[in-house]
């Protein structure tokens, strides 16, 4: 007896006869509703820029965290469910600190990304199978290690890719095509900031201000821009 489409829909570990995992596909669709995030790798470091959706004037803009530090040499931008992103980031922070404690050296960016994707593939850390579901979040992981600057992109299936530039979220299609036109490997960090913010400006539905965008760079240490620094980048547009 074959299961119906809805029964395949419910299981996160049951393939349909066409070889599809519907819950993972739906999680990937959920990211297309999230805020836009852009990452660009340059020879000096990596720049991340994210749209912050401040849905109410009563909301404190600084409490909307869309870029987080994982270790002093790694940061990540996210699109999708923020609670899911926090779970992955907390896991990555523990992994990087354990590595530093055990081996006396920072964890490489690829190993950190691998640790995040291993958890994404297990759909959580608990043994409570009935509660597990794919993480509805995609991450842009920026870092600087002995191999130089690097940018990785992860999705809910637990897959990751290394990129030179990447956009995720609701405006990702338009942003990706703009990145293809404007990106080159000789960009400076300052040019990368300007490109990332100008592309965000195109895809966002409102005026760009320090309250609704976040920018960070890893070169070689992670640094989240202050509102004044964001204002300075906006002034260059």
Swiss-Prot record:
<dbReference type="InterPro" id="IPR001353">
    <property type="entry name" value="Proteasome_sua/b"/>
</dbReference>
<dbReference type="Pfam" id="PF00227">
    <property type="entry name" value="Proteasome"/>
</dbReference>
<dbReference type="GO" id="GO:0005634">
    <property type="term" value="C:nucleus"/>
</dbReference>
<comment type="function">
    <text>The proteasome is a multicatalytic proteinase complex which is characterized by its ability to cleave peptides with Arg, Phe, Tyr, Leu, and Glu adjacent to the leaving group at neutral or slightly basic pH. The proteasome has an ATP-dependent proteolytic activity.</text>
</comment>
<dbReference type="InterPro" id="IPR033812">
    <property type="entry name" value="Proteasome_alpha_type_5"/>
</dbReference>
<keyword id="KW-0539">Nucleus</keyword>
<protein>
    <recommendedName>
        <fullName>Proteasome subunit alpha type-5</fullName>
    </recommendedName>
</protein>
<dbReference type="InterPro" id="IPR029055">
    <property type="entry name" value="Ntn_hydrolases_N"/>
</dbReference>
<dbReference type="GO" id="GO:0019773">
    <property type="term" value="C:proteasome core complex, alpha-subunit complex"/>
</dbReference>
<comment type="subunit">
    <text>The 26S proteasome consists of a 20S proteasome core and two 19S regulatory subunits. The 20S proteasome core is composed of 28 subunits that are arranged in four stacked rings, resulting in a barrel-shaped structure. The two end rings are each formed by seven alpha subunits, and the two central rings are each formed by seven beta subunits. The catalytic chamber with the active sites is on the inside of the barrel.</text>
</comment>
<comment type="similarity">
    <text>Belongs to the peptidase T1A family.</text>
</comment>
<keyword id="KW-0647">Proteasome</keyword>
<dbReference type="GO" id="GO:0005737">
    <property type="term" value="C:cytoplasm"/>
</dbReference>
<dbReference type="InterPro" id="IPR050115">
    <property type="entry name" value="Proteasome_alpha"/>
</dbReference>
<dbReference type="Pfam" id="PF10584">
    <property type="entry name" value="Proteasome_A_N"/>
</dbReference>
<keyword id="KW-0963">Cytoplasm</keyword>
<dbReference type="InterPro" id="IPR000426">
    <property type="entry name" value="Proteasome_asu_N"/>
</dbReference>
<dbReference type="InterPro" id="IPR023332">
    <property type="entry name" value="Proteasome_alpha-type"/>
</dbReference>
<dbReference type="GO" id="GO:0043161">
    <property type="term" value="P:proteasome-mediated ubiquitin-dependent protein catabolic process"/>
</dbReference>
């Amino acid at each position: 007896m074959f299961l119906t489409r809805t029964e395949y829909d419910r299981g996160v570990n049951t393939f349909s006869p066409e070889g599809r995992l519907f819950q993972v596909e739906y999680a990937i669709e959920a990211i297309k509703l999230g805020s836009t995030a852009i990452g660009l790798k340059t020879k000096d470091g990596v720049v991340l820029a994210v749209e912050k959706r401040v849905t109410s004037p009563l909301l404190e803009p600084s409490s909307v965290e869309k870029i987080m530090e994982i270790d002093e040499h790694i940061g990540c931008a996210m699109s999708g469910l923020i609670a899911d992103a926090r779970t992955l980031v907390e896991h990555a922070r523990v992994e990087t600190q354990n590595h530093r404690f055990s081996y006396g050296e920072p964890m490489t960016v690829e190993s950190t990304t691998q640790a995040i994707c291993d958890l994404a593939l297990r759909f959580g850390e608990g043994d409570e199978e009935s509660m597990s579901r794919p993480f509805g979040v995609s991450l842009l992981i920026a870092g600087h290690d002995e191999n130089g600057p690097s940018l990785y992109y992860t999705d809910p299936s637990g897959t990751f890719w290394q990129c030179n530039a990447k956009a995720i979220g609701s405006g990702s299609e338009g942003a990706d095509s703009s990145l293809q036109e404007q990106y080159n490997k000789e960009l400076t960090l300052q040019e990368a900031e300007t490109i990332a913010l100008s592309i965000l400006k195109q895809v966002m539905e409102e005026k760009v201000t320090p309250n609704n965008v976040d920018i960070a760079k890893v070169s070689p240490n992670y640094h989240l821009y202050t509102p004044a620094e964001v204002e300075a980048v906006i002034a260059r547009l």
